[in-house]
Amino acid sequence: MYDLPERVLPRATLQLPTPSGVDARRALLARSAQALGVATADDLRDYYRIPAADVRLPIEQLVEEGTIIPVRVRAWRQQAYLHKDARAGRKIQGAALLSPFDPLVWHRPRTERLFAFRYRLEIYTPAHKREHGYYVLPFLLDGALVARVDLKADRKAGTLIVQRARFEPGAPRCAAEGLIEELRLMASWLGLPDLAIAPAAAIDRLLPTLRVETQPTSVELAPSQSEIAFYE
C-alpha cells in the first residue's frame, strides 16, 4: 500500500529538516543492527537495500560513536557487528512454512551462514536444472530450517499436493510430523480440503505410523483436519 507522506506521517515529523544522505544511511544501518542482532556489513546494507558503495563511511561512524561494536563470529570470514543494546535471544518454539520472500530467507548469504541452509528460488530455472522444485518453501521448526517442500495447489481437485520434500541433515524425527501439521494448516487457509503427498516427497519414510498403499488412500485424521492421500 502507498499513500502521500502528508496523509501518513505526523505533522511534527514532516516539519523536521531532511537529513543528509550520510545521516539517513547511518540511521538506517543502526536500525538494521538493532533488528538483526549480529550482522556483517552486507547484512546491514541489505536490510534496507542500501547500495554497497554507500555503507563504508556510515558504518565507520557508527563504530566510532559506539552504536555498533565490531565482533568476530566463529566460521564467519567477514567482519561482523553487534548493536550496543543487543541482548541474547530467546529460544524459539514453533513451526512455520516460509515464503521465499520471508525476511528470514530473503538475504540468501545470511541464511546460509546462520542456518547452513542454501536456498534459491527456482521458478526461472529450467525444469531439468531445478534442484528442489518450482516454488519451494523452507520449513522452520523450533528455530532451525529443517526441511523444504515443493507444493502445488490443485484448486479443481481441492487438494494441496506435496510434489517433493527434503529434510536437512540432522533434522529431528519430529520434523516430519511438524511439517504435516503445517501442511494441514496451509491447506485449510487455502480452502483446500485434502492434502496429497507424492512418492518423491518421501515424508512417509519418517512417519512409520502412517501406511502407504499402492492405490491412493486416505489416512484417518482427527475431525476437521484435512485428508491425506499418499500416491504410489
Where are the regions that the model predicts?
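Long, low-complexity intrinsically disordered regions
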Residues: 1-97, 102-105, 110, 117, ...
